């Protein structure tokens, strides 16, 4: 019997983790992105620069802005220019947002911390190391893929308009 782990096994594991995180956000009545923004803003002390959210999350700026709009529409956050800036914005939790985060988001975060804490310290370091290595290599492969596609597209575009004098 073959006991080798396959990429399909790994993908299923990652999909399962994504599903669990989605269950946390769904239980709070928020999208995955809005939930993440709420947790990050709360753990940052109640205010966080939008630029920090966009640099630390792998969502598009449009998705992050939509999530922030949801939080502001529900009365959980405000969005204002950073002090002394006419460009950079800061998300701040309202009192209602702080209460919501304490009641729903932070207990979910504590559950995640307990799950990570169930791993031995050497297991914690190993999982971080391995996932970091996999992410780096996959990111490099993605960059190479995008360069290949761009080169193919450019070659196809250069070929357009050329005619054959047959």
Residue spans of the language-model regions?
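Charged, amphipathic alpha-helical coiled-coil/dimerization segments
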Residues: 69-129
